């Protein structure tokens, strides 16, 4: 398995393309997490069956072609997993021992704080496999640092121990950064545990939510850079990419796609201009009969049980991260060949 460098080693730090600079319309300014959309358009039924697409096709060396629509559907299917993630990550995710993992847990089931932890780890100079293993180790038993309160209570030494078990590089510095972040986001532990159960509704998390409401992804990234030690542009972009699938946060950030993820999407053969076009493509071109549950492991069975907006958001994040994974795993060619042969 190739030992690929992490996202920030392949991205131009600090750069946001035009589509990333477009800020989502903020809701009313308030010191609460971004509220779910008060008024939603009529619920759309998932599109089924084939639909003609004018989007460009990517040519393969064998003479076969794969259209953007076909690649989109293939990436969202369970058949694409082996080309997007390391084998040991998928084996661990399928084992049933880990309720939270990067590859198979829908991003809508992560809390905002868990997305912060994930962004912190994936933005470090680690290999693809080490980054995901670190996320899995920290967020599941015997550690289970899913809230800032739990991480703060554990202390820096325990965080270091978890990172050592994951065989993570730069353990000491990363443990220190994560502990400081937990201290920053932890609520008042003398109060009831309700805030902890929601991923840390502390004043600091509310400040982050307010930044998202006021200025969209750009303001969110700027706020994180100025308040969370060790988290830069790339970490902020990863956070925005993932947290938009969480209930309430999409109002301020959706739809957001960072430049690295968009580049990966184009590299695998999905030729789109921006995040808005990706959203439109998902809403119009996904064949639900073929995609099914996307191979994701859910607490509640069945993609049709979810709110339509959540479904689209999960697919949006999933297709971006699977495209990134194929690039990082150096399996773009294999992915394209499999997509062309997929029926």
Segments the model singles out, each with a brief description of its role:
Residues 124-126, 130, 142-143, 186, ...:
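Short alpha-helix boundary/capping elements
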Residues 109-141:
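Extended cationic-aromatic binding surfaces that line active-site or macromolecule-binding grooves
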Residues 103-115, 166-174, 306-318:
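Structural motif
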Residues 143-229, 241-246:
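Alpha-helical ds-nucleic-acid-binding substructure associated with the helix-hairpin-helix region
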Residues 116-120, 134-137, 158, 162, ...:
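A general alpha-helix detector
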Residues 110, 127-132, 171-175, 233, ...:
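Alpha-helix N-cap/helix-initiation sites
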Residues 2-102, 217-227, 233-343:
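C-terminal accessory module of base-excision DNA glycosylases/AP lyases that mediates lesion recognition
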Residues 114-124, 180, 317-328:
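Short, hydrophobic/amphipathic alpha-helical patches that form generic packing surfaces
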């Amino acid at each position: 398995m190739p030992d690929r460098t992490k996202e920030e080693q392949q991205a131009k730090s600090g750069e946001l393309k035009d589509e990333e600079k477009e800020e989502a319309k903020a809701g009313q300014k308030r010191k609460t997490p971004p509220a779910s959309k008060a008024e939603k358009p009529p619920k759309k039924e998932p599109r089924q069956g084939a639909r003609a697409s004018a989007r460009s096709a990517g040519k393969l060396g064998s003479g076969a072609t794969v259209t953007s629509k076909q690649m989109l559907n293939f990436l969202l299917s369970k058949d694409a997993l082996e080309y997007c993630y390391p084998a040991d990550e998928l084996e661990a995710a399928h084992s049933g021992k880990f309720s939270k993992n990067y590859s198979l847990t829908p991003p809508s089931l992560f809390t905002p704080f868990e997305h912060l932890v994930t962004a912190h780890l994936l933005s470090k100079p680690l290999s693809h496999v080490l980054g995901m293993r670190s996320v899995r180790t920290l967020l599941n038993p015997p550690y289970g640092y899913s809230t800032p309160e739990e991480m703060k209570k554990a202390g820096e030494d325990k965080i270091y121990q978890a990172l050592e078990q994951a065989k993570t590089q730069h353990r000491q510095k990363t443990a220190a950064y994560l502990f400081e972040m937990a201290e920053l986001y932890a609520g008042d532990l003398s109060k009831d545990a309700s805030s902890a159960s929601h991923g840390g509704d502390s004043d600091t998390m509310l400040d982050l939510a307010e930044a998202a409401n006021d200025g969209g992804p750009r303001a969110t990234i700027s706020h994180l850079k100025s308040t969370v030690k060790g988290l830069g542009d790339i970490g902020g972009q990863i956070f925005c990419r993932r947290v938009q699938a969480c209930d309430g946060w999409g109002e301020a950030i959706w739809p957001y796609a960072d430049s690295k993820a968009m580049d990966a999407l184009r590299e695998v053969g999905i030729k789109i201009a921006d995040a808005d076009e990706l959203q439109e493509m998902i809403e119009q071109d996904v064949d639900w009969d073929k995609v099914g549950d996307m191979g994701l492991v859910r607490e509640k069975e069945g993609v049709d049980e979810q709110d339509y907006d959540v479904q689209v958001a999960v697919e949006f994040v999933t297709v971006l991260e699977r495209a990134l994974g194929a690039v990082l795993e150096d399996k773009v060619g294999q992915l394209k060949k499999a997509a062309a042969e997929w029926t």
